[in-house]
């Protein structure tokens, strides 16, 4: 099958690369020439500057110029195409609605080219971007408006966790396809032939609207799990001194009806999907006159989590951040990615600087490049107070307190490094519960505050 993937961000690049593994002729299209040059290089460092996913560079290196091609000239490859996957950004507007300007600009261009093509074979435009329910119908209208012959529309939402996207593309939990005609379903089945009738993969065919809705409900439910544990489980551990968070989690999730996913407590979930998607769903339902109280509570709890540990440090430990040097470990929204979109660290940095912190000494294994883009001093002069280091130990040196914001494995059990690098009085603020032996720290004179636990004062 000849496939075009329009958009080479996290979703598009991963989808294009994995499709090429299965022998499809895949053209990854983007207007950003710098991105394309990085991908063509097959160099992990250059690729990782744009999309940092384990295993992705090796797939690109193995398949480029054989099954996988990168291009900024879509007109030259439009003939003979079986499917065009739309993997385009749909960022939130201020009111929570999805900004579809990038999406429809690309669609207009594609429709113009498709209307002029000489080949008469069936082509399917496939929404892989997360788009509001009903967007597939708008896409159908565009095809009619431009008089595109023999073209169909399908919805095929992605469910890729960042940091594990390659493996989940190869072995997904489910593949959801929404379309109206058997002809369009048949084309998508040929693309995903390895998943159809697979004993461990649910292959679901439905309407476009249902497929669009599945993505929103799935992401909202995942964020609900996280917000429930942060809003209820963590509050118990912080309020009642003898509640052990890990035992609480183990006891609750021992019930087979209750998922263990999301049962960890943290300083909030981030990334490109959860916050954006729940805001879009709230907007869509509100516009339709439906109540959204529960969804707004889920979103509000998650946003609250991102900075509430700073408030707790002031309230419970009497900390004043004015003129302090704060070590910040973790900038990405979670481990195994360099993605900082909606990361808790963004709110942490802004809040610390607003409270008068004199310096933020930051370290992340892979996200420092992204951090420099987000924290550009040209946008806010206070960002000049952020300095970046090559290790946790270097970031800790000379700091007055520590904030752990990302769950990188190398941050787990930092007690010895802390003791060797900084001396008490010193406060550890643990947003990911990465230090299981925190009692040993407090016995040696360090203060400790973690999500899900009350303040542990130095002994």
Which stretches of residues belong to each language-model region?
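Structural/interface elements that position substrates and couple domains in central-metabolism enzymes
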Residues: 1-459
């Amino acid at each position: 099958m000849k496939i075009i993937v329009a958009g080479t961000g996290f979703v598009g690049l991963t989808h294009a690369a994995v499709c090429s593994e299965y022998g499809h002729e895949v053209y990854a299209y983007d207007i950003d020439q710098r991105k394309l040059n990085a991908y063509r290089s097959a160099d992990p460092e250059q690729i990782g500057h744009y999309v940092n996913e384990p295993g992705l560079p090796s797939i690109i290196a193995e398949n480029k110029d054989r099954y996988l091609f990168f291009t900024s000239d879509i007109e030259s490859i439009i003939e003979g195409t079986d499917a065009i996957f739309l993997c385009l950004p749909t960022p939130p507007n201020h009111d929570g609605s999805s900004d579809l300007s990038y999406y429809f600009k690309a669609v207009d261009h594609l429709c113009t080219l498709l209307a002029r093509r000489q080949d008469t074979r069936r082509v399917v435009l496939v929404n892989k971007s997360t788009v509001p329910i009903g967007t597939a119908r708008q896409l159908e209208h565009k095809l009619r408006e431009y008089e595109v012959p023999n073209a169909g529309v399908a919805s095929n939402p992605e469910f890729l966790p960042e940091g594990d996207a390659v493996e989940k593309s190869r072995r997904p939990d489910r593949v959801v396809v929404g379309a109206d005609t058997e002809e369009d379903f048949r084309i998508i089945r040929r693309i995903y032939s390895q998943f159809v009738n697979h004993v461990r993969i649910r292959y679901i065919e439905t309407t476009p609207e249902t497929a669009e809705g599945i993505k929103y409900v799935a992401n909202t439910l995942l964020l609900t799990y996280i917000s429930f544990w942060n809003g209820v489980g963590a509050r118990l551990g912080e309020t009642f001194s003898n509640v052990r968070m890990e035992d609480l989690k183990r006891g609750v999730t021992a019930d087979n009806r209750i998922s263990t996913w999301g049962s960890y407590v943290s300083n909030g979930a981030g990334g490109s999907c959860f916050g954006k998607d729940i805001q879009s769903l709230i907007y869509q339902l509100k516009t339709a006159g439906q109540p959204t109280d529960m969804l707004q509570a889920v979103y509000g709890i998650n946003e609250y989590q991102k900075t509430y540990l700073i408030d707790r440090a002031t309230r419970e430990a009497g900390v004043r951040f004015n003129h302090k040097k704060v070590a910040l470990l973790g900038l990405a929204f979670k481990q195994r990615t360099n993605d900082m979109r909606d990361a808790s660290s963004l709110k942490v940095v802004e809040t610390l600087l607003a409270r008068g912190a004199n310096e933020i000494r930051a370290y992340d294994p892979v996200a420092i490049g992204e951090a420099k883009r987000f924290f550009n001093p040209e946008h806010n002069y206070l960002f000049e107070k952020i300095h970046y280091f090559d290790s946790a130990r270097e970031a800790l040196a000379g700091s007055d307190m520590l904030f752990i914001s990302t769950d990188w494995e190398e941050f787990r059990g930092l007690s010895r490094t802390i003791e060797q690098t900084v001396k008490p009085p010193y406060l550890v603020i643990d947003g990911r519960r990465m230090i299981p032996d925190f009692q040993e720290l407090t016995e040696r004179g360090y203060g400790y505050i973690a999500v899900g636990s009350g303040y542990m004062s130095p002994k």
